[in-house]
Amino acid sequence: MLQRWLYSTNAKDIAVLYFIFSVFCGMAGTGMSMIIRLELAGPGNQYLGGNHQLFNTLVTGHAILMVFFLVMPALIGGFGNYLLPLMIGASDMSYPRLNNISFWLLPPALVCLVTSTLVESGAGTGWTVYAPLSGIQSHSGPSVDLAIFALHMTSISSLLGAINFIVTTLNMRTNGMSMHKMPLFVWAIFITAFLLLLSLPVLSAGVTLLLMDRNFNTSFYEVAGGGDPVLYQHLFWFFGHPEVYIMIVPAFGVISHIVSTYSKKPVFGEISMVYAMASIGLLGFLVWSHHMYVVGLDCDTRAYFTSATMIIAIPTGIKIFSWLATIYGGSIRLAVPMMYAIAFLFLFTLGGFTGVALANASLDVAFHDTYYVVAHFHYVLSMGAVFSMFAGYYYWSPHILGLNYNEKLAQIQFWLIFVGVNVIFLPMHFLGINGMPRRIPDYPDAFAGWNYVSSIGSFIAMISLILFIYILFDQLYNGLENKINNKSVTFMKAPDFVESNNKFNLNTIKTSSIEFLLNSPPAVHSFNTPAVTN
């Protein structure tokens, strides 16, 4: 056991480790968000006894856990590591031992992050860690330093993973698989890896300078010494904006596969989808200052960032309409992954609308640091990235584990989380339009109504998460029985494809990519000889 899991160089085992880790961190992050919602359920001090520093520490912890320890390990480390080699017909990742250290850098990073909240009074900076609040004057203890170390370790982990994905994709494709024939999920991970490679060094530089300011008496961000805190914002957001695309582009890849399978159609405009993802990735590097409209940028700078940000809506729209065109006229089967995919399309588009509103510098001056922004990025992440993780799990886990989940429970879990997240985040738009500021644990009584509704929603979402954990256990314990039951319910009455070839019909899920042609679960070494794809 120790040999297999601790020293593993097998992409599948490492992917499973990533997945277990991300579920654990996701539960911790959800716990933090529940405490935040409990505190905000009513005006005045509710649960934290007036400890506003603790509130901000929880906000920081929630954000960093969800972004760096849930979404990225699950989508890139979990699904990416498991499926990318299978989809391109590779025996493993290009650098298996590098893959191992990529994972094992994350638990120490988690230890640093948790420690940072426990020493002194925690890092109450928000996940952006803006100077001067994160400076040595305002946060005198080791908390922020520990948070910076956590960011450093997750950065190195992701960077090594990105190098691995790029080399694997370029060098280890099977015979006949040109770049044009790669599945969309492989393209998504490939583009994500480039985003990581180009943006993470900038974050590392920015927080390293902050570390120097805090401990070695430099003044990169100290105005008294000739520095400028706005430099930190530029460095952080030059990473921070590509980061949100790092989280959503793998989700795009997952959704493409699911929409295609459950509509029984190839994705509409497959090459356009690749170009759209690449355009989103490129444009993501040219828009970072739209997070900084209120720091005193020039008028023409603001005009540029407004226009450039709106241009990102074009390739995103291409993707949305291509998915809709894939569904249109298809033979649709509303299995659980497809329900998540359709919910993704609807809610991600809503999040995109609010994003276009926030792109306007003139409007953003009013919306900046209000709950409108919180509502916007939670629609995109909590109902974009997270829904695609659930979709991908329900889509691929029966094949990865060889064990089926309980279909009915999964549908209940979908409806619970669908209702829950909307009840949480829809009212936040109204609060934001009325000017309720972010990251403040107390608020005027006028905001009480919608905040109460939002907190009710968080309980619904929490129940769905608990149900998901039960579904996981049920899948591991009763997976084979579920397989028999599910077949009679869905696959026999409404198979994905019906062919005259019986060998083909026995394969329950039919896709255009090769990972489902393997055994279920796949062998430890899936391809000893290259799979020929044409």
From Swiss-Prot:
Membrane topology note: Multi-pass membrane protein
Q: Which residues bind heme a3?
A: H376
Required co-factors? heme; Cu cation
Q: How are cofactors bound according to the entry's free-text note?
A: Binds 2 heme A groups non-covalently per subunit.
- Gene Ontology MF terms in the entry: cytochrome-c oxidase activity; heme binding; metal ion binding
- Protein localization: Mitochondrion inner membrane
Look at the named UniProt entry and state the broad enzyme category this protein falls under. translocase
EC number, UniProt record: 7.1.1.9
Q: Which amino acids does the record list as binding O2? A: Y245
* Family per record: Belongs to the heme-copper respiratory oxidase family.
Protein name, per record: Cytochrome c oxidase subunit 1
User: What organism is the protein native to?
Assistant: Vanderwaltozyma polyspora (strain ATCC 22028 / DSM 70294 / BCRC 21397 / CBS 2163 / NBRC 10782 / NRRL Y-8283 / UCD 57-17) (Kluyveromyces polysporus)
